[in-house]
Amino acid sequence: MKKYILLLLLIPVLSFSQNLKSFISKDSTEIFYEDIGKGKTLVILSGGPGLNSDYLKEFYDTVSKKYRCIILHQRGTGKSILKKVNKETVNVNRYIEDLNGLYKALGNKKLTLVGHSWGGMLSFSYAANESDKIEKIILLNTGGITEKFHTWFGSNMNMR
């Protein structure tokens, strides 16, 4: 009976780990992502920066019934742990490098990015730098980027 109960407790853990994958980013950070569902691929980028994607679970569980959802654990969130958190390890250029690593891990196919809040702003930044790697961008509650916001955001990131 104990073995049966243990098996029941391990099933969710084992099924989660089968969907969890990783790649090594340009700065040697291991970046994790979940791969769930089948169909056209959507890369889901959570808000923050620094916010774990768990708050979007109901969304991507629903969407994964029709699409393949790649849920990126952005650096410093989820399983993508950083040894140090500072302006060298957490900045827009590093996030863009991470998306390039994901692009390669997914077979160099154009990405459809689904960005919520900060994830949408990251989608904008990625598209501005790597437009040849983008198929579509879907924005959810994302603010627009003005020169004033860009200056504020850069200052805010540099203070971290």
List the predicted regions and their residue ranges.
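Bacterial Sec-dependent N-terminal signal peptides
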Residues: 1-20
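Conserved HGGG/HGGXW glycine-rich cap/lid loop of the alpha/beta-hydrolase fold
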Residues: 25-82, 86
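Glycine-rich His-Gly loop
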Residues: 44-48, 117, 142
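Active-site loop/oxyanion-hole signature of alpha/beta-hydrolase fold enzymes
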Residues: 74-114
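Residue in the alpha/beta-hydrolase core beta-strand immediately N-terminal to the catalytic nucleophile
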Residues: 112, 135-138
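Short glycine-enriched nucleophile-adjacent loop
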Residues: 120-131, 137
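Flexible "cap/lid" loop of the alpha/beta hydrolase fold
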Residues: 138-160
